[in-house]
A protein has these predicted regions:
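Extracellular receptor-binding modules and their adjoining Ser/Thr/Gly/Asp/Asn-rich linkers
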Residues: 4-6, 10-25, 39-176
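Short secondary-structure subsegments characteristic of cysteine-rich extracellular domains
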Residues: 27-29
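Beta-strand repeat architectures
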Residues: 31-33
Length: 176
């Protein structure tokens, strides 16, 4: 049901409390006994997805997997140069947690700042290789240590890719 009032019982030690849940933010499937919620304020011990993300104002709406950097007219834009030190993350499609969720902008985008994310990628890569920005806007590539620039590394590859064509590669976003 999507238009109902729910009271969910919570038990803590010897106490019992029924809390009202706003149905505009909640769906309940009685067949699977699953509760889904768009926004949750509280404590969670696990998450279905694997990246920590934040909302930023961008120059446009970007596709999931686009590599982004500080700059442009607002706060962020796509990466535009190889080994770009202002790179901050990857556009996320299914973040585990979104910080700054109430932020408003003409083009609010969700940027994965750490964790596992798919990224647009050009060239070959092996699991564990360091990842940076390429010459293609918003597309990552394997780092060539000869061209290293401080701050240019966005993460490490979690998988192998043996083709030169552009595709998606799962990476661990983080500072290395």
């Amino acid at each position: 049901s999507t238009n109902a009032t729910y009271y969910i019982p919570f038990v803590s030690g010897t106490g019992y409390q029924a809390n009202y849940i706003d149905s505009t933010n909640l769906t309940y499937n009685p067949y699977t006994n699953a509760i889904s919620c768009n926004t949750f304020a509280g404590s969670s011990t696990s998450a279905l997805y694997a990246d920590l993300a934040e909302v930023y104002g961008a120059d446009a709406n970007y596709e999931v997997g686009t590599l982004v950097a500080l700059g442009g007219y607002y706060e962020i834009t796509t990466t535009t140069t190889p080994y770009q030190s202002s790179t901050i993350g990857v556009i996320s499609g299914k973040p585990a947690h979104i910080m700054n969720a109430g932020y408003t902008a003409d083009y609010p985008v969700i940027v994965g700042l750490t964790g596992r994310l798919p990224v647009k990628f050009i060239g070959q890569v092996r699991k564990g290789d360091l990842i940076t920005s390429s010459e293609l806007p918003g597309v990552a590539c394997k780092l060539d240590p000869i061209h290293f620039v401080p701050g240019c590394i966005i993460g490490k590859s979690l998988e192998d890719k043996f083709t030169e064509i552009e595709g998606m590669v799962e990476i661990i976003v983080g500072r290395y």
